[in-house]
Amino acid sequence: MDKNMQGKIVKGIFGFYYVHVAGSGIYECKAKGIFRNQKIKPLVGDNVTIAVLDEEQMLGNIEEILPRENALIRPAVANIDQALVIFAAAKPKPNFNLLDRFLIMMEYQKVPVTICFNKCDLLTGEELHAFSDVYEQCGYPVVYTSAREQRGIDALLERLDGKVTSVAGPSGVGKSSLINCLQPERQMETGAISRKIERGRHTTRHSEIIPIKEQTYIMDTPGFSTLDIPGLEKEDLWWYYPEFEEYEPNCRFKGCSHIGEPSCGVKEAVEAGKISRLRYENYMQLYQELKEQKKY
């Protein structure tokens, strides 16, 4: 008789789903045909019930997908508590336009975000705060780490504790090194999971979850570069720049785009140094992109 267990999908590739069962390890599973018939696709992050088919080989079938807390469009994952976006403080110089895109994608999907600046050992404290203050003033938590010097790791672990965190960032920022710092070597199960799902052989093309400790997971997600959010209208973009809200009532025109109109409270705040000019320039570029998307 098949034995049923509950676990979490930590990776899905080529129709196989790797399910982490706490205390038992990783089971390689296939989804039952009923999901396909109902047009339901299991997602990385799903909590599932599996029927164990072969205990020795650790094979099973996914019998049930438990109710989802949430499901993101991009990346296509489920049951995320928060997101962590990692950028290098230097080498490479942070691309703030890319950072803003990620923040908007997560805000749109109602996922709280923490910003992590890695390689903080390459800059002075004053240099770090010059750009991190911009985001802290917008309400985003910011943490500083150095994977090379093992700095800030405990503070980062505190933010991750007990949560499922989607981790993203452009290449070259030390994301893999930082993820390795978060996995204590004494946890043999984590090492076994890495071997089972062949972690580290490829760049991140598929989302996968890495257990850090009990009830604490990080989800390594593929890179991001475009603002591809179905349903986001250019007129709504300013809502995702929280620092605009205070000055929007000062605009002369209702529905002001904060770009070409005269007597715009947001533009006046930029000129007065109350809103970051860098953030405002990113806003204008993203607004134009959304405008162009509508043409096609």
Where do the language-model regions lie?
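Helix-rich effector regions associated with P-loop NTPase G domains
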Residues: 3, 15, 33, 39-56, ...
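SH3/SH3-like beta-barrel fold
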Residues: 17-21, 29, 50
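Canonical P-loop GTPase G-domain recognition
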Residues: 122-173
